[in-house]
Amino acid sequence: METSTQRTGSHLAQTAAARHSASSRGEAARVSSRDELAEMAAASQGNFEGKFESLDLAELAKKQPWWRTLFGQESGPSAEKYSVATQLLIGGVTGWCTGFIFQKVGKLAATAVGGGFFLLQLANHTGYIKVDWQRVEKDMKKAKEQLKIRKSNQIPTEVKSKAEEVVSFVKKNVLVTGGFFGGFLLGMAS
């Protein structure tokens, strides 16, 4: 005698097997609920017949600089892929946007710093704030000594490698870089 639990279990196994065979024939299997998805996952445990290779995305990202995804897999100059006008347009538009944003943020930052300095001077002259200049001088001397101790003439290897990548990109893509700097200056002026 078969119980309802056994019937349900065998029904689930038949459903999963039917779906697995349908998907293996190339037909699209539709999953209508989470329960069916869980059933399919449970039924397919250990039924993989091929060897799968894992892909380490962190290692791949280290080997693929961002400009390769933007300009293509070739690391060669973009002059081989795009016309002169296209390169100048790409560089000019991105440079203009960057310059415009830099100008707006720079104005806001300069206003905040200048306004804060103005308010501090006003508060100092009206007597709300008293500055202990001897203590400021003593703290500045301490900071100078600490900077002299930590001073190193060597550039870290990470910074050096990134700088080399940037220089290489600039050399290979002169038109895009020139367009960017021209657009940046236009964006700063507008």
Curated annotation (Swiss-Prot):
Transmembrane segments: 82-102, 109-129, 166-186
Protein's gene: FUNDC2
Origin superkingdom: Eukaryota
Modified residues (Phosphoserine): S10, S54, S152
GO BP terms in the entry: autophagy of mitochondrion; intracellular triglyceride homeostasis; regulation of platelet activation
Protein localization: Mitochondrion outer membrane; Nucleus
Biased composition (Polar residues): 1-13
Stretches assigned to the Mitochondrial intermembrane side: 103-108, 187-190
Record keyword Transmembrane present: yes
Annotated protein name in UniProt: FUN14 domain-containing protein 2
Role of this protein: Binds directly and specifically 1,2-Diacyl-sn-glycero-3-phospho-(1'-myo-inositol-3',4',5'-bisphosphate) (PIP3) leading to the recruitment of PIP3 to mitochondria and may play a role in the regulation of the platelet activation via AKT/GSK3B/cGMP signaling pathways. May act as transcription factor that regulates SREBP1 (isoform SREBP-1C) expression in order to modulate triglyceride (TG) homeostasis in hepatocytes.
Annotated segments matching region Disordered: 1-31
Molecular-function GO terms, alphabetical: phosphatidylinositol-3,4,5-trisphosphate binding
GO cellular component: mitochondrial outer membrane; nucleus
Membrane topology, from the record: Multi-pass membrane protein
Recorded family membership: Belongs to the FUN14 family.
Species annotation: Bos taurus (Bovine)
Topological domain ranges for the Cytoplasmic compartment: 1-81, 130-165
Keywords: Membrane, Mitochondrion, Mitochondrion outer membrane, Nucleus, Phosphoprotein, Transcription, Transcription regulation, Transmembrane, Transmembrane helix
